[in-house]
Amino acid sequence: MDRQFKRTLITTALPYANGPVHIGHLAGVYVPADIYARYLRLRGRDCLLIGGSDEHGVPIALKAKAEGCTPQEVVDRYHELIKRSFEGLGISFDIYSRTTSDIHRRTASEFFKTLYEKGEFVEQTSEQYYDEEAKQFLADRYIIGTCPHCSNDRAYGDQCEACGTSLNATDLIDPRSTISGSAPVLRETKHWYLPLDKHEPFLKEWILDGHKEWKSNVYGQCKSWLDMGLQPRAVSRDLDWGIPVPVEGAEGKVLYVWFDAPIGYISNTKELCPDSWETWWKSEDTRLVHFIGKDNIVFHCIVFPAMLRAEGSFILPDNVPANEFLNLEGDKISTSRNWAVWLHEYLEEFPGKQDVLRYVLTANAPETKDNDFTWRDFQARNNNELVAIFGNFVNRALVLTHKYFDGAVPPKGELTDCDSRTIEEFAAVKQALEHQLDTFHFREALKEAMNLARIGNKYLADTEPWKLAKTDMNRVATILNLSLQITANLAIAFEPFLPFSSAKLMSMLSTDCPFGWDRLGSTDLLPEGHVLGNPELLFEKLEDSVIDAQIQKLQDTKLANEKAAHQAAPIAEDIAFEDFLKLDIRVGTVLECEKVPKADKLLRFRIDDGLSGRTIVSGIAKHYAPEELVGKQVCFIANLPPRKLKGIESEGMILSAEDADGSLRVIMPAAEVAAGSQVK
């Protein structure tokens, strides 16, 4: 950070209020944001940490429909749960509000109207699916159908969750409404678009030239989007849950949630600081920092800055230190499959151990690549680092002081070379910590803080005061004085990371007033004669039985998912026998098979069909290596019209069966038959 700012505004991605918060959210966004905010406050810097719940959009409307309640009831329930969970973990928001608040509705509406009146939107008419039975337009998640890539018949109108392909609703085969189950029809509808292409030259200069210091994963994703060329993006949609578009002729339309949600940062600041919010959002002396996950990079680095620039009076983000994803026990976290460690459950099952989770998530943070959380690693880091290094040193320093000096800080005598080296080592921690925290390297910063405890342990091991107590109490006094100064330094260094443990440590040191960051590295934090509190265990060892219970909990979830997946899908509606006879299903021999360039999921087949041969593209690359299928016989539908996939004309569909775990298995004849044989 070359430029000096007077204040820092820190925002965190708004969690979606249709479910609880899990460890992936925490590791990606909220723990690092809280560490940074606590660090700045400890340094005496003027900063705000802004948070809130994202409460509009299709998933919330769908959840309400499934539960037979209103969307407002859904968001009320989860907003309170999320807010309590954050408080329980010590996420120190200056405000945690919500996008259903009156002030947010007004702020988002005014923002839209400002851009509308300035002519910053373009109006476009497009075709969108409409449910004639329900008499409403269908947003992408209100439509399901068959994925054209992997044949999953439960793909949504925006994405197939089986193969991960992004889709448009019109890509789906046999689309149907999730509301009525009927086949929707295409109807024209008008929407407003933010012309991102208009802002592309500015964004290229601002990001690619002006922010080369951004994290490589953030900069790289932005560059990729800019290199592909930006397209206009709809800011409205046909939906009955959200903030109504505030212009005439927009009945039944609401602000798209991606446009609505980031304005929540502004409205939440207005709610907190009604008289001074503009200082935080419109002053060039304010530094704006967005903490987000990688799925929000484009919105916060390209779309939201384009919105702010179009409005004209707001500052732009100075940094967006986005993290990658955290996996769980080797598998992607999934809320729909309940494959997660939920924060509210953790707080109930591990009372008083908030800092253990904060420590593990920071030590294993997915800062530049996806990382994995395992319960065995959680246990090992607690037992081998927090207990054996940090807690062990603090306990020895305090217990020995109580034993030899009745719990009072002993005088510091003449320093030896060992003392001087130790002082020099722990004094250097401050600068190392500042460098890592200022550049958003929280994992490395935590290592530097823990290094301070390692310095203390080594010092006690080298000096062995328990042996010197028999012959040289003056030397013991100096050793324990320095050990206590290191202990007090640990309370400062760990406050951003482990606030509960730092507060407990301050209590054991009998110090009510917290030390400022500027005193980190000092050797006079605790004056001679200061009486310490009673020593307690700062951390407790986690037994195997505790961890085994958590692993079993996940195993039970996995078994439940497999059981649910094994239930056969409902039988489709009857069709006429004549319609079935129209399908020409044949057996072909695979002559060639290769991956399609720039398409992770697609394989290109050259098939001997007993005639002139044909090319078929199939979305099974994640389930087979190409060489596995060469020479094998497969079943395929031969009379589908050709369809281009990634520029390759596909002349049919290879038939596969989907297993309970989502894997695909190509259907093959039990014994070899002549190429081109029909399936009867």
UniProtKB/Swiss-Prot annotation:
GO terms for biological process: methionyl-tRNA aminoacylation. It is found in: Cytoplasm. One of its GO terms (molecular function) is metal ion binding. One of its GO terms (cellular component) is cytosol. A motif ('KMSKS' region) lies at residues 332-336. It comes from the Bacteria. It holds the Pfam family Anticodon_3. Keywords: Aminoacyl-tRNA synthetase, ATP-binding, Cytoplasm, Ligase, Metal-binding, Nucleotide-binding, Protein biosynthesis, RNA-binding, tRNA-binding, Zinc. Residues 579-680 form the tRNA-binding domain. Binds 1 zinc ion per subunit. It catalyses: tRNA(Met) + L-methionine + ATP = L-methionyl-tRNA(Met) + AMP + diphosphate. Its EC number is 6.1.1.10. Zn(2+) binds at residues 147, 150, 160, 163. Gene3D superfamilies: HUPs, Isoleucyl-tRNA Synthetase, Domain 1, Methionyl-tRNA synthetase, Zn-domain, Nucleic acid-binding proteins. Is required not only for elongation of protein synthesis but also for the initiation of all mRNA translation through initiator tRNA(fMet) aminoacylation. Belongs to the class-I aminoacyl-tRNA synthetase family. MetG type 1 subfamily. This is Methionine--tRNA ligase. It comes from Porphyromonas gingivalis (strain ATCC BAA-308 / W83). The lineage of its organism: Bacteria, Pseudomonadati, Bacteroidota, Bacteroidia, Bacteroidales.
